Each structure stands twice: as structure tokens, then as C-alpha cells.
Amino acid sequence: SVVKSEDFSLPAYVDRRDHPLPEVAHVKLLSASQKALKENEKAAWSSLSMDEKVELYRIKFKESFAEMNRGSNEWKTVVGGAMFFIGFTALIIMWQKHYVYGPLPQTFDKEWVGKQTKRMLDMKVNPIQGLASKWDYEKNEWKK
């Protein structure tokens, strides 16, 4: 079977809010009832019923503005996919913390950090603008 490509130099039907009147009608090949309805269209529109007017509209347009403006439910898929990947990442991180990484080194203990800070103060590290400049050596406390 041969696939026939569409000739884009010819007018095409497009449903867009910024282009409300397409160049051609939505339905190109009319059935017998649609042809009869198109003949009735030439008469007074007051003689047509509401269903006939809607059918005429559907021949010309695929969607109304209300249908075009209706929101899609795609956001639910996007949020669901994002939550899935966030949850999967959390599971990987928990697995890594339990099985891959060892315990924290002793240098992260509060006691160790306090001893290291005291050692830096005793060595008077960066006495002009740094840590030692904020320490009162006479009172043995932080300056206020």
C-alpha cells in the first residue's frame, strides 16, 4: 500500500483560537443528509431547528471555542510522572545511605567540632577579620 502525502500548498482545516475561520470546512465529503442540510441552509435560518444549526456548524468546524478552551488532563500525567521519579530517587538515596555509605566520620560530631574550634582559637587563626578576631581572649568568650 502506498501512503499518499498531503499537499501543503492547498488550503487545510485547522482548529485554532488565533485563527478562528479555517480556509476549508472540517467535513470535505458530505453525506446525502448533509448535502440536503446544506441546501436547507440557503433558505431562511429561522426555519432551521437548533439541531440542524448545530449539524451545520459541525460540518464547518470540528470544535467550538468552548471545546478548544477546555483544559486537558495532561497536567495529572505530568505531576504523576514527576512524583514517581521523586519517589524513586528517594528510594535510591535511602538504599545508598543504608548499604553504600558508611557511618559519618568522627569529625562531624559536635564535640569534635568544638575541640577543633578551640584549637583554631588557641592558634589565633586569622586574627584580623576571621575567627580569632571575634573571640575575647581575656574573658574566654565570643565578643558581643
From Swiss-Prot:
Q: Which PANTHER family match?
A: CYTOCHROME C OXIDASE SUBUNIT 4 ISOFORM 1, MITOCHONDRIAL, CYTOCHROME C OXIDASE SUBUNIT IV
Mitochondrial intermembrane side stretches: 100-144
GO cellular component term of the entry, any: mitochondrial inner membrane
Keyword Glycosyltransferase attributed: no
What is this organism's lineage?
A: Eukaryota, Metazoa, Chordata, Craniata, Vertebrata
Q: How does it assemble?
A: Component of the cytochrome c oxidase (complex IV, CIV), a multisubunit enzyme composed of 14 subunits. The complex is composed of a catalytic core of 3 subunits MT-CO1, MT-CO2 and MT-CO3, encoded in the mitochondrial DNA, and 11 supernumerary subunits COX4I, COX5A, COX5B, COX6A, COX6B, COX6C, COX7A, COX7B, COX7C, COX8 and NDUFA4, which are encoded in the nuclear genome.
PTM-bearing positions, type N6-acetyllysine: 4, 28, 35, 42
Family per record = Belongs to the cytochrome c oxidase IV family.
**Keyword Mitochondrion among record annotations:** yes
Task: List the stretches on the Mitochondrial matrix face of the membrane.
Answer: 1-73
- State the species of origin: Hylobates agilis (Agile gibbon)
This protein's membrane topology, according to the annotation, is: Single-pass membrane protein
| Designated name of the protein | Cytochrome c oxidase subunit 4 isoform 1, mitochondrial
